[in-house]
Amino acid sequence: EVAEIVRQKHFGGEAFTRVWANFQSFGDESAFHRDFPVKYAQSARTAVWYPVMNWERDWGGDFITLSEDGEVDACALVKPNRLVVFNGTQTHAARPISRYCSELRIAVSFGCEVVNA
């Protein structure tokens, strides 16, 4: 149900070409990366959904994107049921989780190289 809502509202009804889940806890690292090659910069889209029931701000795990010159472009805190939509060719990463966090950071991602929305 969530996937269909995301597909219709943020992907113009286009089929996803990738769907994946990431699980992160204290001690896990996430490197900066792009979901799709830069050649899709005009059309790629990724949506990251956080299906967590509870998340404290001080637990970390923030989602961060970088500009083309490597500076922080945007940052979003993890919040229950939050959806972050961005250009899938943009460099991004999840920041580390605090040692005070005993929860699992869950992120479900939906992506498509060509979105006509």
Task: Please provide the spans of the model-predicted regions.
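Fe(II)/2-oxoglutarate oxygenase catalytic core
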Residues: E1-L83, T89-A117
